[in-house]
Amino acid sequence: MEEFKQRCLNQPYGDVGHLLRPLAYQKHPYQWPTIGKDLSHVANATLEEVKAFFFRFYAPNNAILAVTGNISFEEAVELTEKWFGSVPRREVPVRNLPQEPEQTEERRLTVERNVPLDSLFMAYHMCDHRHPDYYVFDILSDVLSNGRSSRLNQHLVQEKQLFSSIDAYISGSVDAGLFHIAGKPSAGVSLELAEAAVRDELDRLQQELVEDRKSVV
């Protein structure tokens, strides 16, 4: 509960994900943040419910172990067997989540809060993590916002000074995810003007080839 308050309620823009997810997903469970939609979902969870969830999904055959450092593969296997070998496998439900229908119209939400600066958050549906184009979107997000020479930073922050900061990134979801653009317009710049400038840059991205040197920054 304290983590929910700290991350989602007690800081500016902390609940952006809670507001954006239901806009983007109408059927898929991604509309639910992992931590819950509101504080009551955490507060009202019983110990029995938590234990049932744990023993339903937390099993060695439903986990990935990542090991880094100065260790050989053989040592990693030996230590894994030592510390986790006695944990029994369990029957885990087959992952069968509903597919999100194609979005055919724009959805938008305007929220007024006591925050330091206006902020613009845009999201577009993209392919899932297993699709070859996933890496294309990953590179496109870098072309748009990774480094001072990136398109959004160069054109909208440095040249036109429409934004004080702006970023583009992908959600990295296993199922179909989102391509995000988030930025804070400069003082005196309306959200409408800021949004129009971003859309212009996206149009330009479709019309102009990306230089080779920029695609590997």
Q: What does each model-identified segment do?
A:
Residues 1-92, 110, 128, 136, ...:
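Charge-rich, well-structured scaffold segments of protease-associated domains
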Residues 5, 22, 92-149:
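His/Glu-based metal-binding/catalytic segments typifying zinc-dependent metallopeptidases
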Residues 153-154:
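Phosphate-proximal small/polar/acidic motifs at interfaces that engage nucleotide phosphates
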